[in-house]
A protein has these predicted regions:
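N-terminal Rossmann/SDR dinucleotide-binding element
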Residues: 1-49
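SDR active-site strand-loop-helix element
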Residues: 11, 50-56, 94-100, 148-150
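Conserved catalytic-core motifs of eukaryotic protein kinase domains, centered on the activation segment
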Residues: 21-22, 60-67, 105-109, 159
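Hydrophobic/aromatic anchor residues within beta-strands of the central parallel beta-sheet
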Residues: 28, 68, 94, 145-148
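NAD(P)H-binding glycine-rich loop region in Rossmannoid oxidoreductase-like domains
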Residues: 33-71
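Conserved Rossmann-fold NAD(P)-dependent oxidoreductase catalytic core, especially the SDR/UDP-sugar
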Residues: 77-121
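Active-site helix of classical SDR
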Residues: 126
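NAD(P)-dependent short-chain dehydrogenase/reductase
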Residues: 135-178
Length: 178
């Protein structure tokens, strides 16, 4: 069935501005999922749907091995564990943003669903591990998870960052800046 959105909760390490007028309440929480205990704060209200977009970008994950695993893997694992431990039949829909970085080159023009993962970077490895965790937690009935492999997730404002996919942001951002 379908139902109206009752509330949206945003959670990030940095609070981004959002429109003042919207048709449903938007709560904003600040915190770091890679810190144990932080994910439980999100699960208290038992959201029906969780969009998990948290990660550091590919170039930064490659440059700082420990930080990449802490944020990209541990943060995801802590979130999944908070969901599992909530118990009481709680089983949210979890949409996990993965990456085409799980595939090593060369790969075909059209990548089938069953194409094997052979990441060439730490970032790709972290995303591949998280995909396996998502599949296992879903298989065990702790969540209804789906992973989406994108070439990029959003256009980032400001100066370019270390993301390998940063050129996508540049394509949009540069013309807008004049």
């Amino acid at each position: 069935g379908s139902s109206a959105i009752a509330k949206v909760t945003r959670h990030d390490v940095v609070i981004a501005p959002h429109a003042v007028h919207h048709i449903f309440p938007i709560d904003t929480l600040m915190g770091d999922l890679s810190v144990q205990g932080e994910a439980e704060k999100l699960i208290v209200d038992r959201p029906d749907v969780i969009f998990h977009l948290a990660a550091i970008v590919s170039g930064e994950a490659e440059a700082n091995f420990e930080k990449g695993y802490q944020i990209n893997l541990d943060g995801t694992r802590y979130l999944f564990e908070a969901i599992r431990k909530a118990g009481g039949g709680y089983k949210p829909k979890v949409i996990f943003t993965s990456s085409i970085a799980v595939f090593g080159a060369p790969f075909p023009d059209a990548i089938p669903d069953d194409y094997f993962t052979t990441p060439l970077t730490s970032y790709g490895t972290q995303k591949a591990i998280c995909e396996l965790l998502l599949a296992d937690y879903s298989r065990r009935g702790f969540m209804d998870g789906v992973g989406l492999r994108f070439p990029t997730v959003c256009v980032r404002p400001g100066k370019p960052n270390l993301a390998a996919s940063g050129f996508f942001s540049n394509i949009i951002r540069e013309p807008l800046a004049g």
